[in-house]
Curated annotation (Swiss-Prot):
Job of this protein: Essential for the control of the cell cycle at the G2/M (mitosis) transition.
Top-rank lineage group of the source organism: Eukaryota
UniProt keywords, alphabetically: Cell cycle, Cell division, Cyclin, Cytoplasm, Mitosis, Ubl conjugation
Protein name in the entry: G2/mitotic-specific cyclin-B1
Ranges annotated as biased composition (Polar residues): 1-13
Length: 361
């Protein structure tokens, strides 16, 4: 049975959260204080940059908000054009419907593998982008039918190895990947599968994930000067959306759905089950449809499919890696918010969306 072993070897990787790498000759590693300053000299240098006459509070807050938005998008004036490009670019990578049909590996085998990969992803403290890219690589390889059932786990761990090289700053050593499979696969086998993956995909790994679209939609929905939103409530809603997006990774049916549609559906469902002051659900649907350039029927179809998949994958009791992951306080413990009543509401949303979509035809 696939499982991420608990006794992970001590790696050479250093935790970056509370320690800062000391430069050569500066002595041992030193804890970083709350402001990230290691020396008094650094503190004096930063204080020297502060203006002696600070701006009025309102002006300073407005300037800070603009700077934060600009830092988030790097080129705020082009944000809409970037989003449109991402929507156009994702069409290049759409998988065929029912790409898992016709032999082995089966959708059930894939679901078990993805659940195990989520466990490995959590154990290695990898970024969410790495997980999404891992599953994207896995599905593209499965569509090409170049991997047998016997090599499915090797394909999965090698896909994560490639994805971590693409997304991570501090990536695990290849021996960590060997160890996490309990030495079922050697370094040589992982490197050989890496070559197979890159050659089969022509080194093209740059598909935008649903997480990218979710962040864009979150920025758009939260920019409402007329009616400021409840940021704390929106944090919970955003994490519920992320959870729903990862539940979609478990099911091969969602692999042929555009990532922008998955992100839109996850945000609509999350706003319905966890409303946010300052954001009206109906208005949010209109904003999302306009931003996506899609009809309401297309979004309703995506909501119906994601609601059905999320309900099924969260309710089942065997593959619980994502459910356990979102019990973390770093992810707002949104698994605890997914009560039976909330899940039933999601299920009803899926059924209602199906009815609404059929009436629009």
């Amino acid at each position: 049975m696939l499982r991420a072993t608990n006794n992970r070897r001590t790696s050479n990787n250093v935790e970056k959260d509370s320690l800062q790498m000391a430069k050569h000759g500066n002595g041992p590693l030193k804890p970083v204080n709350a402001q990230g300053l290691q020396t008094k000299r650094e503190a004096r240098e930063i204080l020297a940059l502060k203006p002696s006459n600070p701006a009025p509070v309102e002006t300073a807050q407005k300037s800070q908000r603009i700077n934060l938005q600009d830092a988030e998008t790097k080129c705020l004036a082009m944000a809409d054009d970037i989003y449109k490009y991402l929507v156009h670019h994702e069409k290049k990578y759409l998988l065929e419907e029912c790409f898992m049909e016709g032999g082995e590996p089966t959708p059930k085998m894939r679901r078990i593998l993805v659940d195990w990969l989520v466990q490995v992803h959590v154990r290695f403290h990898l970024t969410p982008e790495t997980l999404h890219l891992t599953v994207f690589i896995l599905d593209r390889m499965l569509q090409k039918k170049v991997t047998s059932k016997a090599d499915l786990q090797l394909l999965g761990i090698s896909a994560m190895f490639v994805a971590s090289k693409f997304e991570e700053v501090y990536l695990p050593d290849i021996h960590d990947y060997e160890f996490i499979t309990e030495n079922t696969y050697s370094k040589k086998q992982i490197l050989a599968m890496e070559q197979t993956i890159l050659n089969s995909l022509n080194f093209d790994l740059s598909c935008p994930s649903s997480l990218v679209f979710l962040r864009c939609l979150s920025r758009i929905l939260s920019e409402n000067d007329a009616s400021p939103i409840d940021n704390q409530a929106f944090c919970y809603t955003y994490n519920i959306s992320k959870c729903l997006g990862e539940l979609a990774l478990l099911d091969s049916v969602m692999a042929s759905t555009p990532r922008s549609h998955i992100a839109s559906a996850s945000m609509i469902i999350a706003l319905e089950v966890h409303p946010v002051d300052g954001i009206e659900a109906e208005n949010a649907v209109s904003v999302i449809c306009k931003q996506l350039g899609a009809s309401k029927k297309v979004i309703e179809d995506a909501v119906a499919l994601l609601a059905e998949v999320s309900y099924k994958n969260f309710k089942q009791g065997k593959l619980v890696a994502i459910k356990n992951k979102y019990q973390s306080s770093k992810l707002a413990q949104v698994s605890n918010l997914m009560t039976d009543d909330v899940l039933e509401k999601i299920n009803r949303m899926g059924q209602n969306a199906k009815v609404d979509a059929s009436e629009m035809e």
